[in-house]
């Protein structure tokens, strides 16, 4: 029954919506990000090319901290980003959890049927929903 519920809950119900995504432009440097956004509250930060509809990857907060500690303030986000997988907003949480495990990733880019960014979803988001459903 729990798995059935997770098949009915869609990414769009759980994701962080576009209007509140904290993301970084790919040409920003470590110095730019540290100056503008410290302390950084998120462990994984989406990186985009021109706008949020062109998310090209994500950076780990610890990579930013490490580059800062090594005085590598001129390193661009495009040089340290990891690839990000894109999913459709109507995918079920059950399928998304499987995909997180299969890809060994912890953040996905969420789009609508037109490929427009609608949000991001993390493994933590999906696990929280799984735990809530298990308690019901």
Language-model features: locations:
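Soluble cytosolic regulatory domains appended to membrane proteins
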Residues: 1-136
């Amino acid at each position: 029954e729990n798995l059935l519920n997770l098949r009915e809950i869609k990414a769009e119900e759980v994701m962080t919506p576009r209007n509140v995504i904290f993301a970084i432009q790919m040409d920003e440097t470590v110095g730019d990000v540290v100056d503008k956004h410290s302390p950084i509250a998120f462990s994984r930060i989406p990186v985009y090319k021109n706008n949020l509809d062109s998310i090209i990857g994500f950076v780990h907060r610890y990579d930013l901290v490490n580059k800062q500690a090594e005085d590598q303030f001129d390193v661009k986000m495009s040089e340290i980003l990891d690839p990000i997988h894109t999913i459709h907003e109507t995918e079920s949480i059950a399928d998304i959890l499987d995909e997180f495990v299969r890809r060994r990733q912890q953040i996905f880019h969420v789009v609508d049927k037109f490929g427009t960014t609608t949000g991001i979803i993390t493994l933590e988001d999906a696990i929280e929903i799984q735990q809530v459903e298990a308690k019901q």
